[in-house]
């Protein structure tokens, strides 16, 4: 649909809004075959829930299904789609997301709605004075959307569980590959990083049919960076 074919210049000028995520520099995170969509965009979200509903209606009646396994993040939805070389903290500064944040929290950034420089200014404010509110809000929105998905797969006779796997992109340097990292840094890194990626572990207790699953790729390598980053151990 050409309505959603928007260039970075239009996004930066404020003359059009993208259905893709936008980073701190005002660039859309568009990947292979249009990946990089913003799950907070209504059109994108409706497409997700409609597809999930179709899957559930097709397979719900066969029984014996434990639940639905979904990967969140990197290029998969719902999540903050993160291209290689970037982290979740750098993603999510589009006009729609910022307007929703301001509306939900009552916090006003008081920045212009046009011009490329507004994205870097948003990043500075939301990772500075409004850090706690920003990342708490992102985790709440992710939780709300996850609950909506869970409701879809419980709408029939057979109630499926939802298993959510955050696929977050780690920075090149972190406490599990820095020789001077402290035990405290390693003990808190995973939880802090999940919060920044919109998956605050405190919002998931596994008792309501929604389970946050630890990231377990690269586990067989058992190197200090890989093993530590996926288990929050190594101290």
Model-derived features: positions:
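Acidic, His- and aromatic-enriched active-site or binding-groove loops in soluble protein domains
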Residues: 11-30, 90-109, 181-204
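Active-site-adjacent "subsite" loops/lids of carbohydrate-active enzymes
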Residues: 1-60, 112-135
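Aromatic- and carboxylate-enriched substrate-binding clefts and catalytic-loop regions
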Residues: 1-9, 32-33, 71-114
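Active-site regions of oxyanion-processing enzymes, predominantly non-cytosolic
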Residues: 65-71
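A Trp-anchored, charged/polar loop motif used as the substrate-binding/catalytic surface
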Residues: 42-57, 143-147, 188-196
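Substrate-binding cleft/loops of secretory-pathway carbohydrate-active enzymes
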Residues: 74-80, 149-234
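Short loop/turn motifs at secondary-structure junctions
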Residues: 59-65, 206
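Active-site neighborhood of glycoside hydrolase catalytic domains
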Residues: 50-51, 63, 90-162
